[in-house]
């Protein structure tokens, strides 16, 4: 067969349809009996934004009560052993700790946005604490 020169043609923008092999065509046309339906997945970030809106609306505590109570008791033992706490005292501590952390993360997020980032980093937390006057 003689070689012929190919001429340039305008592209239509899509791939040309391929011919399927007989075995692949048979597999596609046959109904799948044991096929498992793929679970629905949201785009990345959609669920995160939904959670942000949900937690901004809510007023309930975000840290579980018992793990927080154990942490408070563990820290208090370094200062004095056999300390007892009223449940309302631990509740008040938890309220104030969560309020502090939420406001710190808000300031940290502003620092990340100022640096033209969307991800907070440890240097953002350090800057937020320094601007607040908490850092040595």
UniProtKB/Swiss-Prot annotation:
<dbReference type="GO" id="GO:0030527">
    <property type="term" value="F:structural constituent of chromatin"/>
</dbReference>
<protein>
    <recommendedName>
        <fullName>Histone H3</fullName>
    </recommendedName>
</protein>
<feature type="modified residue" description="N6,N6,N6-trimethyllysine; alternate">
    <location>
        <position position="10"/>
    </location>
</feature>
<keyword id="KW-0488">Methylation</keyword>
<keyword id="KW-0238">DNA-binding</keyword>
<feature type="modified residue" description="N6-methyllysine; alternate">
    <location>
        <position position="15"/>
    </location>
</feature>
<feature type="modified residue" description="N6-acetyllysine; alternate">
    <location>
        <position position="24"/>
    </location>
</feature>
<keyword id="KW-0158">Chromosome</keyword>
<dbReference type="InterPro" id="IPR007125">
    <property type="entry name" value="Histone_H2A/H2B/H3"/>
</dbReference>
<feature type="modified residue" description="N6-acetyllysine; alternate">
    <location>
        <position position="10"/>
    </location>
</feature>
<feature type="modified residue" description="N6,N6,N6-trimethyllysine; alternate">
    <location>
        <position position="80"/>
    </location>
</feature>
<feature type="modified residue" description="N6-methyllysine; alternate">
    <location>
        <position position="19"/>
    </location>
</feature>
<dbReference type="GO" id="GO:0003677">
    <property type="term" value="F:DNA binding"/>
</dbReference>
<feature type="modified residue" description="N6-methyllysine; alternate">
    <location>
        <position position="5"/>
    </location>
</feature>
<keyword id="KW-0597">Phosphoprotein</keyword>
<dbReference type="Pfam" id="PF00125">
    <property type="entry name" value="Histone"/>
</dbReference>
<dbReference type="GO" id="GO:0009303">
    <property type="term" value="P:rRNA transcription"/>
</dbReference>
<feature type="modified residue" description="N6,N6-dimethyllysine; alternate">
    <location>
        <position position="5"/>
    </location>
</feature>
<dbReference type="GO" id="GO:0046982">
    <property type="term" value="F:protein heterodimerization activity"/>
</dbReference>
<feature type="modified residue" description="N6,N6-dimethyllysine; alternate">
    <location>
        <position position="37"/>
    </location>
</feature>
<feature type="modified residue" description="N6-methyllysine; alternate">
    <location>
        <position position="24"/>
    </location>
</feature>
<feature type="modified residue" description="N6-acetyllysine; alternate">
    <location>
        <position position="28"/>
    </location>
</feature>
<feature type="modified residue" description="N6-methyllysine; alternate">
    <location>
        <position position="37"/>
    </location>
</feature>
<feature type="modified residue" description="N6,N6,N6-trimethyllysine; alternate">
    <location>
        <position position="37"/>
    </location>
</feature>
<keyword id="KW-0007">Acetylation</keyword>
<feature type="modified residue" description="N6,N6-dimethyllysine; alternate">
    <location>
        <position position="80"/>
    </location>
</feature>
<keyword id="KW-0544">Nucleosome core</keyword>
<comment type="subunit">
    <text>The nucleosome is a histone octamer containing two molecules each of H2A, H2B, H3 and H4 assembled in one H3-H4 heterotetramer and two H2A-H2B heterodimers. The octamer wraps approximately 147 bp of DNA.</text>
</comment>
<feature type="region of interest" description="Disordered">
    <location>
        <begin position="1"/>
        <end position="43"/>
    </location>
</feature>
<feature type="modified residue" description="N6-acetyllysine; alternate">
    <location>
        <position position="37"/>
    </location>
</feature>
<feature type="modified residue" description="N6-acetyllysine; alternate">
    <location>
        <position position="15"/>
    </location>
</feature>
<dbReference type="GO" id="GO:0000786">
    <property type="term" value="C:nucleosome"/>
</dbReference>
<feature type="modified residue" description="N6-acetyllysine">
    <location>
        <position position="65"/>
    </location>
</feature>
<keyword id="KW-0539">Nucleus</keyword>
<feature type="modified residue" description="Phosphoserine">
    <location>
        <position position="11"/>
    </location>
</feature>
<comment type="similarity">
    <text>Belongs to the histone H3 family.</text>
</comment>
<comment type="function">
    <text>Core component of nucleosome. Nucleosomes wrap and compact DNA into chromatin, limiting DNA accessibility to the cellular machineries which require DNA as a template. Histones thereby play a central role in transcription regulation, DNA repair, DNA replication and chromosomal stability. DNA accessibility is regulated via a complex set of post-translational modifications of histones, also called histone code, and nucleosome remodeling.</text>
</comment>
<feature type="modified residue" description="N6-acetyllysine">
    <location>
        <position position="57"/>
    </location>
</feature>
<feature type="modified residue" description="N6,N6-dimethyllysine; alternate">
    <location>
        <position position="28"/>
    </location>
</feature>
<dbReference type="InterPro" id="IPR000164">
    <property type="entry name" value="Histone_H3/CENP-A"/>
</dbReference>
<dbReference type="GO" id="GO:0005634">
    <property type="term" value="C:nucleus"/>
</dbReference>
<feature type="modified residue" description="N6-methyllysine; alternate">
    <location>
        <position position="80"/>
    </location>
</feature>
